[in-house]
Structure formats: structure tokens, C-alpha cells
């Protein structure tokens, strides 16, 4: 005997049973799982040919990419003390590349030198952990095999991370956590750059020479490198293609030298607005200020002044992207 309305009820029960089975027995597809981004892609070695994110980034930059600097500092080190020569290059690769791995995660970068950023393939959790693991390995190896280099490495690594922390705090707290006077802003940014980037370059001199006699030179080289990188981020179309985004720093509300100068330029309130709320409109108007002749000329003058005394060193760095984007 059929009961009126039984059909819809039985249908609902059947649908509910099917849904229960699907949700209880069938795993969530990887592409739909919110944790998949953190985990990374399965079998990344089939994509890159390499199982490790550090090895992947090292392949992009090339092994021992600091070698030209080592040869200029000490032309005979490779012959006189080959184990130390190799160790210095291993340390520089490890510290520099591992900082990049974590930096790309912090910035949410999609690309590094035109290639997918490591965390986009291996996942941010594994990429960050591998970076910490590699740095720990190199610290342990240095302490055991070259104990005389360990204090230099530890001190400079501390300074690098202090500078990075300053930059991240500014990004977190926004313009309210940054000095208000133009002179103080520039000084604060230079201090951060001297720690984050300067300590990396000074580390090379400390490791090779085991003294601080090259500190002044490497601080200048580092400042030029930081300034050049800051300028490329907002003025270079080639760099934008490699990063996959124009003005990535501004989108990330990160302080850079052009942005710091633009805060006190005519119409600088647009830069403040973009740092507080990076909407497309605010970003667009802020870029007009950052790319204005006023800011661009100041950046160009600073590049020329800081690079004048270290031209031979800068040729070794080999960065040639053109600053072709204007307001």
C-alpha cells in the first residue's frame, strides 16, 4: 500500500544517503582541498626534475653564484685553500637562496627570475622548512669544520634577520609604524637595508678575509644592490615580467626607497593610501607619484652616487634590467 507523499521523502533519504557516502568515504579532491596549497604539488620532481626546493632555486641562480666576488677579494683562495673556498661558496649559496625561499613566501610571489617560485610547486610549509633545515645544516658544518668562520656567520645572519624583521614589522603596522619626518624615514630605511642586505654582502668579506676590512665597500655595494632592486620593482617592465606583477612591493605594502621618497613627494598622500589600502585605484595613483620625475630623479641620482666608487664590483653582479617605466 502506497502512502501519499512517500515518494519525495524516499527521494530525500536516498539523496542524503548518497551525500553521506560521498562526504564520509570519498576523499576531497586535491585541487579543492584548502590545505593543498600549503602541502604543495605531488611528486614535484616530475615537474622540476628536483625533489628539493633549495636545489630547485639553486638551479635557477646557478651553483656558487658568488664565485666572481670571491675571486676578486682573494684571487688565490681557490688554489691556496680549496676546502675553505668551497665552504665559503656553500655558505653564501645557502644563506642567500634560503632567504629568497622564505622571502618569496612572505611576499606571495608567483615567480622568481621568470620561473615559478619554489613554494608554488613544493608548498610554503615544506619550502620554509627546507630553508631552515639547509641553514641549520650549514651552521652545523661550519661550526664543526671551520670554527673560525662560525662567529662571522652567526653575527651576520643575526643582522640579516633583524633587518628582515624591521621590514616585516613596517609592512604589518603600515605607515603608522614608520617615522613621520622625511629625513628620519630615509635614515630608517637605510638602516634596515644595511642590516638585511648589507650584512649579506659583508658576510662574504668576513668569510674570505676573516676580518672586517672590506665592510665599508660591501656596505656600499649592498646599498646599491638594494636600491637597484627597489627601483626595478617599480620602473622596469622586464623585471615585472620576471616577477609576474608590476610593483609587487607596493601591492604588498612594503617599504622601498622609491616608496619612502614618494611619501613626501607632491600628491604623496596617494602613496600613503596605497600602503594603508592597496586598492587598484590607490595603487594606480600611487604609481604615478612613484614614477614622477621628482621621485625618479632622486632615485637615479642616488644610484649614480652610490655606484660611482664600486663600478668594478657592480660589473660582477651583472644586473642590467632597464628602468623604462615612467608616469
Curated annotation (Swiss-Prot):
GO function terms (MF aspect): metal ion binding; prenyltransferase activity
Glycosylation sites: 211
Chain residues that bind dimethylallyl diphosphate: 112, 196
Ranges that cross the membrane: 3-23
Pfam families reported for this sequence: polyprenyl_synt (PF00348)
Keywords, in A-Z order: Glycoprotein, Magnesium, Membrane, Metal-binding, Transferase, Transmembrane, Transmembrane helix
UniProt protein name: Prenyl transferase janC
Higher taxonomy: Eukaryota, Fungi, Dikarya, Ascomycota, Pezizomycotina
Amino acid at each position: 500500500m502506497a502512502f501519499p507523499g512517500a515518494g519525495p521523502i524516499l527521494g530525500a533519504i536516498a539523496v542524503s544517503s548518497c551525500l553521506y557516502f560521498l562526504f564520509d568515504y570519498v576523499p576531497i579532491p586535491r585541487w579543492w582541498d584548502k590545505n593543498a596549497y600549503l602541502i604543495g604539488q605531488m611528486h614535484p620532481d616530475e615537474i622540476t626534475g628536483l625533489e628539493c626546493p633549495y636545489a630547485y632555486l639553486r638551479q635557477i641562480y646557478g651553483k656558487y653564484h658568488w664565485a666572481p666576488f670571491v675571486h676578486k677579494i682573494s684571487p688565490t683562495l681557490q688554489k691556496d685553500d680549496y676546502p675553505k673556498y668551497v665552504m665559503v661558496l656553500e655558505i653564501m649559496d645557502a644563506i642567500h637562496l634560503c632567504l629568497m625561499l622564505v622571502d618569496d613566501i612572505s611576499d606571495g610571489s608567483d615567480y622568481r627570475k621568470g620561473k615559478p617560485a619554489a613554494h608554488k610547486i613544493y608548498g610554503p610549509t615544506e619550502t620554509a622548512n627546507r630553508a631552515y633545515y639547509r641553514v641549520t645544516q650549514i651552521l652545523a658544518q661550519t661550526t664543526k669544520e671551520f670554527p673560525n668562520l662560525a662567529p662571522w656567520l652567526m653575527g651576520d645572519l643575526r643582522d640579516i634577520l633583524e633587518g628582515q624583521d624591521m621590514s616585516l614589522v613596517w609592512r604589518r603596522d603600515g605607515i603608522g609604524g614608520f617615522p613621520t619626518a622625511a629625513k628620519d624615514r630615509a635614515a630608517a630605511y637605510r638602516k634596515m637595508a644595511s642590516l638585511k642586505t648589507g650584512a649579506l654582502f659583508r658576510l662574504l668579506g668576513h668569510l674570505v678575509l676573516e676580518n672586517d676590512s672590506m665592510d665599508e665597500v660591501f656596505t656600499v655595494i649592498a646599498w646599491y644592490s638594494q636600491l637597484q632592486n627597489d627601483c626595478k620593482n617599480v620602473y622596469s617592465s622586464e623585471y615585472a615580467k620576471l616577477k609576474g606583477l608590476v610593483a609587487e612591493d607596493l601591492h604588498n605594502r612594503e617599504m622601498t626607497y622609491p616608496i619612502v621618497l614618494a611619501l613626501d613627494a607632491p600628491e604623496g598622500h596617494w602613496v600613503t593610501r596605497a600602503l594603508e589600502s592597496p586598492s587598484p585605484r590607490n595603487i594606480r595613483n600611487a604609481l604615478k607619484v612613484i614614477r614622477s620625475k621628482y621621485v625618479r630623479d632622486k632615485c637615479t641620482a642616488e644610484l649614480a652616487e652610490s655606484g660611482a666608487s664600486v663600478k668594478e664590483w657592480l660589473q660582477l653582479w651583472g644586473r642590467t634590467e632597464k628602468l623604462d617605466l615612467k608616469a
